[in-house]
Amino acid sequence: MMVIVFYTGTHYNIVMHQFWEECGHIVSPVSRFTHYIISENTCRLVHFNVKGMITSMKIAAVIAEYNPFHNGHLYQLQNIREELGADRILVIMSGNFMQRGIPAIVDKYLRTRMALENGADVVLELPVYYSLGSAEYFAQGAVSLLDKLGVIDYLHFGSECGNLQSLQEIASILSSESDTYVTYLKEYQKKGESFASARYYALMQELSSEKAVLTKEPNNTLAIEYIKALMMRQSSIQPVTLKRQGNGYNALSLNNELASASAIRNFMQDKQADYVRLADQVPSSVYSSLMDNQEYLYVDDFSSILYYKLISSFHAGHDLSDIYDMTESLSDIFRKHLTEYTSFQQFCLDCKTRNVTFTRIARSLMHILLDMHQETANQLKENDYTFYAHLLGFNDKGRDVLKAIKGNSSIPVFTRLPEMLKKLDGAALTSLQADIYASQLYYGMQGQKYHHTPINEFRLKYNPC
């Protein structure tokens, strides 16, 4: 492993001598500027101040949705501080639309504040093409963004199994795409199995059933995709997993203080719900934020605009073939059931089949709603996924992280949309425009539902805490 040293002060010889005295390592310059490499057993980011005093910073990252932030998320951030010993925590967070194909229950800036008040130091936005992507695309986009920042030591994530070695073994098979695996994957897909089921049966040919079955759990699946993305990039970021506590990812019960985000959203959507029950499920600051800002959005709030989008597309002879992650068979299903349309959620249930899940349908409908195109997704992948980092918020500790990023990131970090619209072009600009459009639609629906002018994100700078 390596230690990367950044020195921007004066008296280089004196400072480097002091470093050698304190750390016992010979320093060899790798450029004529400020970067030096020192051999050691762990990867650390080391900074010198102008007086030559050494300060070190271990930075961990989390990829999250926080929809909303709850006790399980708090447990993870506390574990990162206490068990991993991280000095700073950076979060890559989905914006206003989630991987399940639903809108965020509260907007990205309020969720950023929740995170910063409960252990995060910096929050960056995951572009919408990844936040609304499959598990693989979601992970590839998020890991690409983290890797390009150039300062992250660890990627910390939850999993049902909590066994990093088993997850890495599966990720290795998936990333290498062995002939055996690929052959069986295609064979089971031809038999009508969903991708997830086909992958499970294909992995059974190379792994024990005890390990292959791990892919059937949602957090394990994302964990495997994170590890696979790190492997494919040959990233120096080290994966760390934490066994999920409390209710399962899809559980809808509030009978546990570590209830899932799904259970909390389901409870909040009930108009007869006693919100006092939420106080045991989320940190006190989050509870206060949710009670003070009751402008919640749900997928059915987008029912009318989705119906208009579908009927206008089909009426114009558009077969939806250019839509992101769309297939001809899925388009036919949508056309077939359109005459039965009553709401977004019910339409997903009507269109669900044995090998097409509710979530896959919901994501595809959001792709239609947000004019997300397969050509753009392909361009993003071909150009290594990410081109910018949108800063949603930070606290005082986060300033150190931002300074480190500024000196090491291969992509720009920005707080104001107008400045980036002027600087980006090509696929990068298309990606940012998709983010802007998604937020404008979200805030537009929020404004209509709660009878106020939509939030204008172009006037926002950042959300310090």
Q: Each predicted region: which residue ranges?
A:
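Active-site cores that bind ATP or allylic diphosphates and position pyrophosphate for catalysis
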Residues: 126-465
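Compositionally biased, intrinsically disordered low-complexity segments enriched in Pro/Arg/Gln/His
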Residues: 29-32
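A glycine-rich helix N-cap at a beta->alpha junction
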Residues: 117-127
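N-terminal catalytic cores of NTP/NDP-binding nucleotidyl/phosphoryl-transfer enzymes
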Residues: 54-111
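Methionine residue identity
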Residues: 1-2, 16, 53
